[in-house]
Design a protein with these regions (language model features):
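Flexible, glycine-rich active-site loops centered on histidine and acidic residues
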Residues: 2-22, 83-154, 213
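Hydrophobic faces of well-ordered beta-strands that scaffold small-molecule active sites
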Residues: 4-8, 44-46, 74-77, 104-108, ...
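Active-site mouth loops of central-metabolism enzymes
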Residues: 12-27, 79-86, 179-189, 280-291
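An alpha-helical appendage that flanks or caps ligand/catalytic pockets
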Residues: 129-174, 207-208, 215-307, 340-353
Length: 354
C-alpha cells in the first residue's frame, strides 16, 4: 500500500429527521477533504447512489474539492453508469480533470442493488438485462471512446452551422478533451470476470467492499485472487502503462475511551450471503489498537496486493470524528503499511510483478 484515502457514502438525514442535512453533508465533505489534503492523505472518494439520502451528483462536489485543495486526488467509488449519458459524462470528466490538474480517479460500474425498481428508466434509459448490465456496458464503451477523442457527431451543412467553423461533414469529438484521462478511469469490480474485463479495457481496478463470489479462503483471499487475475489479464493485453488497484476497508483505530465507545463493537468477521441474486462474500471491519490493526492489515492479502487503500468512513458523524479516524490511521498505521504521503509528490507505482 502506497496511497490511502477516504471513501464517503454521503449519508444524510431525511427532511425533518435529526442528523446532517443534504447541504451539511456536501459542505462537510469539502471541509474533510481540505483537512485530509493538509495531512498528506492521497485521496477523497465518494460513492454515488440515486433515489436515496446519499451523494448523487458527484461532479459539482469533486470540482469544489479540487478547487479548494492542492494535492489530494478526487474521485468516485463508484458512478452508476446505468444513470449516465456517456457523452455528457465525458464532458464533465474532462472538465473536472482540467480543474483538478489530473488529480482525478473516477470509479465507474454497473452499480449496486438500490431502493428504486429500474430507477434508470426514470432518467430516460432502457436496458434488456433486468439489472441493467447491458446498458452500463454500452455506456462505458461509449464514454471511453469519447474521452479518447473518437468522433461522436459531424458538422452540419454550412447554412445550418452557427457559428460557421467547420467544413460540412467534419468529424466532431467531445470537448473539452483532457489528454491521458483514460489512465485515471477505474472500473468497480466485484467478480473475477469483471476484473479481467477491466484489464482488457485498459482501466484501473477498484475492487469492491464485497465480492460476488464465494469459495475457499477469506474475503481478502478471494479479493487478492481477483487482483491477481486482473494483473495477469493486463499483462496479456500488452498495455504500455502500469495500472493502479484499490481496495476498500472499514478501519477504526481505537486510541481512546471515546473511540472504544463509538467503534469498539464495529469489528466483525467476513460474512457470506446473497446480493443481487448472486452468492456474495462481505468483507470484515477492523477495530482495534494500532499495533493490532497493523498486524491484521499486513496479513490482509488484498491490502498487501493493492497500491491504494480506501477507508470507508461514517460520514454522518461529522468532520471532527472522521478526521480523527483518518489522522489516527495516517499517524499510527499507514506508515507501517508502506504509505507515501502526498506531500512527498506524485506517486510512482511499481511495474507489475507477475
Amino acid at each position: 500500500m502506497k496511497s490511502f484515502g477516504f471513501l464517503s457514502f454521503g449519508h444524510y438525514a431525511p427532511a425533518g429527521r435529526r442528523g446532517p442535512s443534504g447541504r451539511d453533508a456536501l459542505h462537510q465533505a469539502i471541509e474533510l477533504s481540505v483537512a485530509a489534503d493538509e495531512l498528506g492523505v492521497n485521496g477523497a472518494y465518494f460513492r454515488v447512489h440515486h433515489f436515496a439520502n446519499q451523494a448523487a451528483a458527484p461532479m459539482p462536489l469533486l470540482a469544489a474539492v479540487a478547487a479548494r485543495t492542492r494535492r489530494i486526488e478526487v474521485g468516485t467509488g463508484v458512478i452508476d453508469l446505468r444513470y449516465e449519458n456517456p457523452l455528457h459524462l465525458a464532458e464533465e470528466a474532462a472538465a473536472l480533470d482540467q480543474i483538478a490538474d489530473g488529480r482525478v480517479a473516477l470509479g465507474m460500474s454497473r452499480g449496486a442493488p438500490e431502493i428504486a425498481q429500474r430507477g434508470w428508466e426514470a432518467f430516460g434509459y432502457r436496458a434488456e438485462d433486468p439489472r441493467g448490465a447491458d446498458l452500463a456496458r454500452a455506456n462505458f464503451e461509449r464514454f471511453l471512446a469519447a474521452i479518447e477523442g473518437a468522433p461522436m457527431a459531424q458538422a452540419a451543412p454550412l447554412g445550418e452551422q452557427y457559428p460557421t467553423s467547420c467544413a460540412p461533414g467534419t468529424p466532431l469529438r467531445i470537448l473539452p478533451h483532457s489528454e491521458g484521462l483514460r489512465q485515471r478511469i477505474w472500473w468497480g469490480s466485484g467478480t473475477t470476470a469483471s476484473a479481467q474485463r477491466a484489464a482488457r479495457d485498459g482501466v484501473n481496478l477498484m475492487s469492491s467492499t464485497l465480492v460476488l463470489e464465494t469459495g475457499q479462503g477469506s474475503f481478502a483471499d478471494l479479493q487478492a485472487a481477483q487482483i491477481a487475475a486482473y494483473r495477469r489479464a493486463w499483462k496479456e493485453a500488452g498495455h504500455s502503462w502500469t495500472p493502479r488497484v484499490s481496495v476498500s476497508r472499514s478501519v477504526f483505530p481505537l486510541m481512546s475511551e471515546r473511540d472504544r465507545r463509538l467503534y469498539g463493537l464495529a469489528a466483525s468477521g467476513d460474512q457470506v450471503g446473497e446480493l443481487d441474486q448472486s452468492p456474495t462474500t462481505f468483507g470484515r471491519a477492523y477495530a482495534a489498537d494500532p499495533d493490532t490493526l497493523v498486524r491484521q492489515l499486513q496479513q490482509d492479502a488484498a491490502v498487501a496486493s493493492a497500491d491504494t487503500l480506501l477507508l470507508t468512513i461514517p460520514n454522518q458523524l461529522g468532520v471532527d470524528a472522521n478526521l480523527s479516524i483518518i489522522e489516527n490511521f495516517a499517524r499510527c498505521i499507514a506508515p507501517e503499511l508502506g504509505w507515501v504521503p502526498s506531500t512527498r509528490g506524485p506517486q510512482e507505482h511499481d511495474p507489475l510483478l507477475l
